[in-house]
Amino acid sequence: MRYIVSPQLVLQVGKGQEVERALYLTPYDYIDEKSPIYYFLRSHLNIQQPEIVKRHILLTLRMTQLKGYLGNLLDIKDDIIIYSHKNNLEYSYVDNTIFNPFVYTQKKTLLKNDSFLYNVYPGACDFLVIWVARACDTSIPEFGSYEDVDNNIIKFETMLMDVFPQLDLDITVESKFNNIFRTNLKLTGLKKIIQRVQDLDINYKSLLSRYDEHFINMTGNHFILNDEQLNLSIWDLDGTLALSSDGDTVMINNVKLFTDLVSDIDTQMERIKGDITYKVHLATPINSRIKLDIETSFIFIETATNNILLSSDKKISIILAKNHISIKVKNHIPNIEKYFTFLVIAINAMFNSVQKSADFTKVETVYWSRICQNTKNKNRKPVIINYLDPGMKKISNNFYRSDEKEVFINDNDIMFTCMDPLGKYNKVGFLNIFHDMRKYCIPCCFLHDQSHRSTFSSCVHQIDVEKKIVSPYILNFGKVVTESKMSFLPIIFDAFLNDGMTANMEQDNKRLKETSGYHIVRCCTGNDIVRLRTTSNIIQFVNEDKNILIVNDMVYFPMNASDIGKKIHILIQEIVHEVMIVKKKESSDKIDFFPPNYKLLKDLFPKQTIQTPIQSDAGMVLTTDGFYIDGKLFNEDLSSKYVTFTKNVITSDAVAKYFSPLFKYVISEAKDRFIKTWMINIMIHMNVDPNNIIPTLEKYYPNFGRVQIN
């Protein structure tokens, strides 16, 4: 998809706020008659032919920088006031009413700020209209000011316009990953979103649900509730969860849909804050080792790592790679990831158009000093030589070997060999971490022959290494695990599941050397990421997936012992991962994965019962395993436009005490969630005599529910 840089509009107004000049700013040579800016000009201002100016307001400017730029653009030397009809710019009222210098009121406190344009004008990437008035023409001339233009901004803009025609802005935004936002979207807002989905008639499935303190679920579109937990879920046409909100947070997988739904309705949502990461794929490669040759602090801040940039407010981080850019922002700003990608591509065209080769000798302090270092007893740093010894055998075009020496020749024809005075580290190999990240072949000295390693095959024989090959390094538990990684289990489960199993690690690091079998954590197979945000989500997932799930120090089982599958899942940062057994031979980097020993956890399953009817009528049967209609389990989500009231039933002390032994063991579900179920509520509604509660429980859950009775 080709990114189109949106036009911008600058309006200079006179004493009566009449438009004196209308400047249509664009990097293109024409007016986009389909753009919202042109529609606004024609329909609202009745201006058919604005001044077309080949310039561009950088959205990264502060208000003072913007004011200096606009004074230069309009050639105004007087004090000016800048404002907009859509958002507050340099001035705002304390209640966030839109400021207009021609309609000033002293009844509200006026605040001045010098924030960044894209922060105060969230829609600026798509629609930017700025009004400029001479301060003396307004009712508050004392609020005006004059700012000198930053010549570096003008210089950068000139270079930007010069290179713009040659920019390849074909990009694809692949993912929005950290998509849980903090908000305060309450009942009114949730119901308005539901109504908006229904009004749009877009065939998206929507569900408004609630659950009380007894975790009895109710679903529907209309409720009368008092401070009880709500959840709104909307699914895409393909069944993928597009957004979900519990009122305090909102998970957004489809940002465009969410923006469209709330753009013109009052959801009474005061804030929406959170992190979101975009991965933008580029049609044309860039130089990731970016170097800025002029002052550009009004756009980016350079970091110590030459492929990482920060926005001027340090709230947006940009990681550059050859074929893609990762952009992490603190708050959702529509299309900001595309705009920053445009700036990065432009800067590459300005300053980094020639792709330079990464000569290993020029980055010696980065790689050798940190990774492949010499110590008292280890000499792992390769040395550079000028010639090959006679009689060396050619292994490949860049690798030679003799009985005494191995030599690697990099792309710059520099020869590396290992000459350990102690005679130990004399085998040339390569650092996996840099090869995995950048395909750099960084030589290092090893104790043993490295020719069996996949990285060696890639660097020496140019054999493509499978992209999803798993690194033998095992991460500490707690980080999200990608396809090429694995991590340890939490300490308590590592000790339990790996009792009697061993994993030999290389000295001084967490690189797996050899194991005949060891339980670890892997990402789940397949392309779909499963997020579980609430206890309700966890229970639903376990019962539908029918496998064991570890969450923190708890183990969740499906409701029925007969349903338990052979997989073990584990939740890390709300993302479902998989527990597997890893096996590896010392002589190879190849890693094999096998199913876990699920029986270790299954044997701890605390509730084993046979299916027992509780009450039946007209083909409907309530059992200890669920509610059945004509023999079929009823598990449909209900959607109703009727108001429903339920009376909560308090679980008696006798019931809680009866089930208390269960909770000395691994917990299948939360205590209240297990005791206060439909079964308990209905049993009590059946007018069971309080004196007979224990006998009734023994009928349906004998022996505290731990032993199955045949």
Curated annotation (Swiss-Prot):
An example Gene Ontology CC term for this record: virion component
Source superkingdom: Viruses
Keyword Cell membrane appears in the UniProt entry: no
A single GO BP: positive regulation of DNA-templated transcription
Principal localisation: virion
Family stated for the protein in its record: Belongs to the poxviridae VETF large subunit family.
Protein's recorded name: Early transcription factor 82 kDa subunit
Organism: Variola virus
